[in-house]
């Protein structure tokens, strides 16, 4: 199994459709997706464009949908929830389609939407995704970070390294293809005993802290291997627990 890591959507090669892709946005989109599906959401549909989201959401009855979105870490006007994993409680999302647009994560999902198998991962469902990849046994996996407005993010690289490290421990066939992933593995080894600390010193972590109290979000996003949910794209842009 060949593993590659791309820091942001723009780094993903053109004209190639990978066998399997894993998109990461630790703070906070893929953590929120995991918790929404864990808490009973029917599905999560992701949009890079807010207007497109609103138009598509109009086709659903109000009781069958919930709008989740942020820009710059703040809830979008007219949306039901922002991008906090704590907000997507069972009471809020159970049985509903979550229409979601965020600053960074939804762009990365859009970039690799044609992958043969597309999953989202956060630290809480790292082990579940690793087990699924072992079961699928693809020849090549692209791990794609979300970054912040097109630039590198520490926390996504931490999670990429965490996934790769776990797969390397369990599979002899794993091959690390690029230096980006090798560096991410080293990052994980350095911070694996203080995951929340790494999230807090990251520039995006500092940005979140600067706009309000996100202590509970940090703790949630830093939790490791406590969810078994596997968000998988079942149709273009739509994720469901698989």
UniProtKB/Swiss-Prot annotation:
GO molecular-function terms, A-Z: 2-phosphosulfolactate phosphatase activity; magnesium ion binding; sulfopyruvate decarboxylase activity
Catalytic activity entry: (2R)-O-phospho-3-sulfolactate + H2O = (2R)-3-sulfolactate + phosphate
Class in the EC hierarchy, top level: hydrolase
Cofactor field: Mg(2+)
Record-listed E.C. numbers: 3.1.3.71
Entry keyword set: Hydrolase, Magnesium
Record InterPro entries: ComB-like, ComB-like_sf
Protein's UniProt keywords contain Magnesium: yes
Top-rank taxon: Bacteria
PANTHER family reported in the protein's UniProt record: 2-PHOSPHOSULFOLACTATE PHOSPHATASE-RELATED
Family, similarity comment: Belongs to the ComB family.
Protein name: Probable 2-phosphosulfolactate phosphatase
Organism of derivation: Prochlorococcus marinus (strain NATL1A)
């Amino acid at each position: 199994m060949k593993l590659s890591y791309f820091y942001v959507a723009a780094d993903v090669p053109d004209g190639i459709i990978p066998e399997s892709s894993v998109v990461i946005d630790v703070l906070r989109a893929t953590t929120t997706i995991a918790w929404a599906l864990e808490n009973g959401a029917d599905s999560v549909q992701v949009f890079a464009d807010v207007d497109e989201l609103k138009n598509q959401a109009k086709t659903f009855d109000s009781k069958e949908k919930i709008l989740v979105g942020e820009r710059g870490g703040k809830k979008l006007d007219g949306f039901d929830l922002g991008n906090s994993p704590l907000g997507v409680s069972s009471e809020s999302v159970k049985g509903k389609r979550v229409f979601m647009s965020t600053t960074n994560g939804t762009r990365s999902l859009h970039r690799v939407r044609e992958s043969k198998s597309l999953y989202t991962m956060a630290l809480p469902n790292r082990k579940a995704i690793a087990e699924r990849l072992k079961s699928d046994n693809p020849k090549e996996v692209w791990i794609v970070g979300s970054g912040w407005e097109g630039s590198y993010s520490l926390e996504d690289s931490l999670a990429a390294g965490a996934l790769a490290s776990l797969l390397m421990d369990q599979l002899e066939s794993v091959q690390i293809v690029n230096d980006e992933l090798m560096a991410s593995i080293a990052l994980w080894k350095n911070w694996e005993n203080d995951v929340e600390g790494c999230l807090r010193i990251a520039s995006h972590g500092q940005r979140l802290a600067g706009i309000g109290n996100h202590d509970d979000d940090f703790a949630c996003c830093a939790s490791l291997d406590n969810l078994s949910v596997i968000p998988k794209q079942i149709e273009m842009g739509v994720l469901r627990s698989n």
